[in-house]
Amino acid sequence: APLDEIAELLTAAGVPLISDASQSAGVAEIDVKRYPCLAAVCMPGHKALYGPMGTGILLALDDRIAAKPLLTGGTGSLSEELRQPDFLPDAQESGTPNVPGIAGLAAGIRFVRSVGAANIAAHERKLVRELARALEANERLEVFSHPSQTGVLSVRVKGVPAEQAAAQLADAGIAVRAGLHCAPLAHRTAGTEETGTVRLSFSFYSTPGQAEQAAEAFKLVKKL
């Protein structure tokens, strides 16, 4: 999404902004001080931060976002009280914390910082551009690419439901995600709400050979 334009509108209207950094955390720098309206940034841990599934981060930048815990009780610090503690971190930590997940996410973040988000992004963008060029030569495919995109590429196989295409790609050894990708309004805007798309995601460990393999696999996809 065009964050600059959205932030400008919300700043003028006095509306706080919560930014979804699901596809950008770990590959794009976000200057949180640049946007006065930015109140929080949320991101999953299992994507470009290389952490385990089931982890994530909600970065609250000020008191405009008063996050409430999903579950309460069992904090271990005020067991004699019937109410949830009102101080941090206890207010947000009910039950047994996901220590293995937190440790894994911390290790993933250390990896990203050691390699550099810019270096990871450059590697992924190179592979995305190569794959997009190869797929655009196939008239049966509609490729959704943009110069500023990160390591994610969406493709629609004309006349083939996204789920069918994904299943055939899986048979060829290519793991993709099919559907609306938690963004139905984006698909409505793109005109793919009814069919969905196939989404391919690259990482720092992806190789040019894998991109070539994916391009070849798309040639085999057909309507069942």
Model-derived segments and spans:
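The feature captures the short pre-catalytic strand/loop hairpin that immediately precedes
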Residues: 76-92
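PLP-dependent enzyme catalytic core of the Aspartate aminotransferase-like
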Residues: 171-175, 187-224
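Active-site core of PLP-dependent enzymes with the aminotransferase class I/II
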Residues: 1-13, 26-31, 209
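A short helix->loop->beta-strand "cap" motif at the edges of active sites that frequently abuts
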Residues: 12-16, 38
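Active-site PLP attachment segment
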Residues: 35-80
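Structural signature of PLP-dependent enzymes
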Residues: 88-131, 224
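Conserved PLP-binding catalytic core of the aspartate aminotransferase-like
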Residues: 125, 140-184, 188-190
